């Protein structure tokens, strides 16, 4: 009989928080009402914890679980990605009887169609979508779904510097203060831009669900404007001007995303967890900048108040 080395006692007997496999690629079909299913090429990461008395986990069981669950659940298109990761995590717990918790993550790229802002040119964009489930043998369960989108951000600090410098030059040319202000209001003032990446993850429960499409809209609201793969000249003008009239720090991105999240899901329970992240690739620096917030809906409501439809706080 072949030895099962994983069951041996380790030389250093300490428990491990997470052992598993990453980068497992599978094809997943997601159901759409009245339309053809969406085809996702998805990457799965799966983990269990390991007690101190065992040398290793049986990794082949992880691959077996994913294959079995996908074959069962994807025989026809699934309704949502959270059901899939929950099922995988649940099967992991059943297969690894020594584990006290199991985790399953799914990352996919969703291709979406949209039109450019002025000419209505057809184009596509890539949105990343996530599903994550952590299940405990004690019955605990945390399920998150999320998205990552790209956009353009325009720096308010540099814009104010350019605006102040322009005002001085106009004053030297003989323009009065009122006229200078009218000129600066009429012309989008230059600044440096970034390509931003907004990430939004929200907890889901049996009684609270969040559509991926709405999360995408909320995440996009964090930035100065959307980006497009194809732009005609009129479209390019519209994008650049709109972005420069809606400047955002990376910190602003997370805060506006939080406010839009509360507006989009006004009835979300206070204890629902959310994760918000904005990362901007700087154009005039050699580094990126990042802002994050991990909170509950209740904590955000206490800090922001109840935002009305115009986007202002109703405190």
Swiss-Prot record:
Binds 1 Fe(2+) ion per subunit. It is an enzyme of class 3 (hydrolase). Pfam families: GCHY-1. The record marks 155 as: May be catalytically important. One of its GO terms (biological process) is tetrahydromethanopterin biosynthetic process. The keyword ATP-binding does not apply. InterPro entries: GTP_cyclohydrolase_FolE2/MptA (IPR003801), GTP_cyclohydrolase_MptA (IPR022840). Its EC number is 3.5.4.39. Keywords: Hydrolase, Iron, Metal-binding. Its cofactor is Fe(2+). Converts GTP to 7,8-dihydro-D-neopterin 2',3'-cyclic phosphate, the first intermediate in the biosynthesis of coenzyme methanopterin. Belongs to the GTP cyclohydrolase IV family. Homodimer. This is GTP cyclohydrolase MptA. It comes from Archaeoglobus fulgidus (strain ATCC 49558 / DSM 4304 / JCM 9628 / NBRC 100126 / VC-16). The gene is mptA.
């Amino acid at each position: 009989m072949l030895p099962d080395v994983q069951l041996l006692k380790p030389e250093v007997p300490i428990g491990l928080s997470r052992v598993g496999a990453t980068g497992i690629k599978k094809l997943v079909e997601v159901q759409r009402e009245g339309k053809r299913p969406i085809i996702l090429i998805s990457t799965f990461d799966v983990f269990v914890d390991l007690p101190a008395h065992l040398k290793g986990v049986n990794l082949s069981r992880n691959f077996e679980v994913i294959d079995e669950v996908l074959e069962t659940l994807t025989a026809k298109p699934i309704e949502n990605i959270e059901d899939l990761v929950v099922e995988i995590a649940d099967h992991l717990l059943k297969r690894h009887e020594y584990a006290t918790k199991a985790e399953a993550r799914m990352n996919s790229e969703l291709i979406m169609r949209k039109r450019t802002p002025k000419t209505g040119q057809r184009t596509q964009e890539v949105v990343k979508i996530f599903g994550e489930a952590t299940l405990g043998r004690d019955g605990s369960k945390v399920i998150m779904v999320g998205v990552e989108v790209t956009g353009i951000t325009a720096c308010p600090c540099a814009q104010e510097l350019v605006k102040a410098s322009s005002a001085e030059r106009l004053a030297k040319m003989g323009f009065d203060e009122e006229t200078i202000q009218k000129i600066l209001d009429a012309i989008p003032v230059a600044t440096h831009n970034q390509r931003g990446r907004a990430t939004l993850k929200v907890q889901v429960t049996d009684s609270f669900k969040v559509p991926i499409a709405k999360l995408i809209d909320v995440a996009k609201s964090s930035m100065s404007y959307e980006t497009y793969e194809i732009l005609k000249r009129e479209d390019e003008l519209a994008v650049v001007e709109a972005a420069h009239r809606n400047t955002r720090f990376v910190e602003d991105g997370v805060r506006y995303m939080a406010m839009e999240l509360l507006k989009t899901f006004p009835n979300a329970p206070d204890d629902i967890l959310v994760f918000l992240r904005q990362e901007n690739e700087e154009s005039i620096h050699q580094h990126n900048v990042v802002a994050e917030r991990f909170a509950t809906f209740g904590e955000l409501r206490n800090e922001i108040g109840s935002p009305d439809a115009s986007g202002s706080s109703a405190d």
